[in-house]
């Protein structure tokens, strides 16, 4: 396939939407683990009944069902808010439609959350704000029974096929069934794109300090955001350009498109079947005459082979898991934050929204500071260290603390400039800054002091 044709299609998908004048909206997605407080496996039938009851109460309409007729996605036809299940029925997600005012978004979110909690609590269940399900060992960590999630589960479990690669694979391929994130999408303009990727990529080590909340109890207890490892050391990370951070700065839209061109596809859909195949870089994929993939066959209960030809339309399946992801909607999705304690949910969106308002000041600050950078370490290396509570010897703890405070002040000033009284959403982050802590470190400290994991679950819900 002509490379120029592919390039034009990428530009239309990713860049064209950013050139349209529009208001600044935010889209907020919060994943949460469902916990059975009896320390037994989550009863999926109970989850299905709860979802149906939630729809009745909140006026949501079913949009997607699994192969057994159960609701995967339901939405409010007016606001665009949605309830969904991510990867498995052990995880629930509340997503808010386009919002300009975080205060109004908060009201809607907590209404939905309170309804769910009341329904679940009647059966000794609860939701909580943790990035790794602390009761994962009790659950049936199986995928939602539909083509997409069975394909994804199969893809992640195929890592033994790639043992010849010089990369480490962790042994938790079902991580999507017990890990949760708090994500925000913000509308962006093409004139700001390169600055956004540069500044927010450099910000990632600081975000690790403020937002880490994913401890894999019993393993890797020194790691406060194990979600990074889940993605990077899985089959998603076979092509490192598909996950994590950017190891380079972009100076033009052309360089950004070059990077997107280097990412890999690992699935497409044909004849209603989701096909999985070895991750293949986009340009190489388009040059192949045909590819052999695998799909789940409900009749056999296993995976069968299916040979297909690449098509330009397959660009719709090009999906990466970068910490800053440019989407086809003209938004940048910020993906690196763990689910937060529920009371602090909106600190994630507020932090990113405030800093986007002060984008150029943030870029200048991170370009010229010498606490983190200009000392031989990249942003990616620093984040990898920080999520392990390790610090290069050159870093001054006092200097780092001052830098984090300056960044929080920038976010606060950005929110103040919006004039919507959203600054209070940053209060949890200022508290963490003053205490030099984050939810993961707070949890580990509580456990060291003799508190139970149930104490943490109830505190974070």
Descriptions of predicted regions:
Residues 116, 120-138:
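Carboxylate/His-rich catalytic cores and anion/metal-binding grooves
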Residues 95-106, 185-187:
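The substrate-binding groove and active-site-proximal loops of carbohydrate-active enzymes
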Residues 176-182:
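Short, conserved phosphate-binding/catalytic loop or strand-edge motifs used
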Residues 140-155, 225-238:
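Short, low-order "capping/linker" segments at domain edges
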Residues 145-173:
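Acidic, His- and aromatic-enriched active-site or binding-groove loops in soluble protein domains
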Residues 108-113:
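Well-ordered, non-membrane alpha-helical segments in soluble/globular domains
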Residues 1-93, 97-98, 175, 191-198, ...:
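C-terminal accessory/tail domains of diverse enzymes
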